[in-house]
Amino acid sequence: MSIKIDLKIFLFVFLFLITSQIEMYILLMIFAIIHELGHVIAGLILKFKPEEIRITPVGLQVSFSIDSIEYNEKVNRAKVLNIKKAIIALAGPMTNLFISSIVILFGMFYKEIQYTYIYQVVIYANLLIALFNLIPIYPMDGGRVLKEVLHIIFGKKKAYKVTYIISKTVLILLTMLSSIAILYIHNIAILIIIAYLWYLEIVEIRRYNRRRNIEKLISSIENKEHSLIDSTTAK
């Protein structure tokens, strides 16, 4: 298992420092790491192996691998692999929602803590991380769940295409709403997050285009092979 650091994290730290929001950023990073641990635990339970851990400006990102024999078994069992991937994607946001629920429940029994700073920030931070990650923009958790569900319904090829269209549409709408919000809230953090989402979207568009080109190339080679076989058979 390899560990990599996204150097853009230092840019985020600098931007949050100059905007006097570094404490909030550190707190969000802590709960973002807990969020990712939810993915890891779910992956281990479902017999996936952590392959790479990447430290990014919005927390950790864990890539999983699966044994080739077990992978073939899962493929043969139809949509089991897609369901498991969707469960792993949901595990992170559910972890944050669970933490918020526990803290809220604790506050119901001990009402004096409801007005403390830490109580409100823990709830706010975890709800923010959960809702942010559930946005249907790939490769966010919501986008991953969407892709796996669409894969089950329509198949792999159409799932990628529809996920790409939905992701881009949602991101454009989110950018428009955020632009309006900045005028009233005057919080540069919103701008930073939107910019990072666009960066992720551009990276995924490039991967999507590369994937399509490879699929077209493979399809072209297969068609040529079939044509050669047919012509040889005819002779």
Residue ranges with predicted function:
Residues L46-I55, G142, R206-S219:
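A cytosolic-side transmembrane-helix exit/cap motif
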Residues H35, I55, G92, N133, ...:
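Divalent metal-coordination and catalytic microenvironments
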Residues E148, I152-K235:
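C-terminal transmembrane module of polytopic alpha-helical membrane proteins
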Residues I3, L17-N76, V121-A125, I135-M140, ...:
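Small-residue-rich helix-interface/hinge motifs
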Residues L7-F10, A91-I102, I166-M176:
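Core segments of transmembrane alpha-helices
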Residues M1-E23, D67-S68, V80-N96:
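Topogenic membrane-insertion module of multi-pass membrane proteins
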Residues S20, A91-L127:
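Membrane-anchoring/interfacial helices and their immediately flanking loops
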Residues F12-V13, M24-I33, V122-N126, A181-E201:
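Hydrophobic core segments of alpha-helical transmembrane domains in multi-pass membrane proteins
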